[in-house]
A protein has these predicted regions:
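Charged, amphipathic alpha-helical segments and their flanking helix caps
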Residues: 1-114
């Protein structure tokens, strides 16, 4: 179910952003120099990763924790054709907050950190 959920998030992001992002993909799982270099070269981009799950408020249910790494080549995109980090993050929250797959509860925004 984790893979299906991740793929649904990626598909939703790709559909919403169209060709504005160079890459929308799964985070490769490590922070090696090669991974960082690739992520920076392919900006702007969004990478999705599942961080794990904990016990939910309802018995027998889990609460999954997801992270969306947003990579940009500028903070504030002033040109319409080049979104900055601020614009990407705002739009990402708008398109994913409350989004649900067939088998999951809605995704809710918790926090953004820099």
């Amino acid at each position: 179910m984790i893979t299906e959920t991740e793929q649904a998030y990626i598909a939703r992001i790709r559909e919403y952003f169209g060709n504005e992002l160079v890459s929308v993909d799964t985070h490769p799982g490590d922070w090696s120099d090669g991974v960082l270099r690739s992520m920076l070269i392919n900006a702007p981009a969004i990478y999705v990763a599942w961080l794990g799950a904990g016990e939910g408020r309802t018995r027998g249910r889990l609460v999954s924790h997801w992270v969306f790494y947003v990579i940009g080549d500028m903070l504030n995109g002033r040109e319409a054709s080049r979104p900055g980090l601020y614009q990407i993050v705002a739009r990402l929250i708008a398109v994913l907050n409350g989004f649900r797959t067939e088998k999951t509860s809605p995704l809710y925004f918790e926090k953004a950190v820099n």
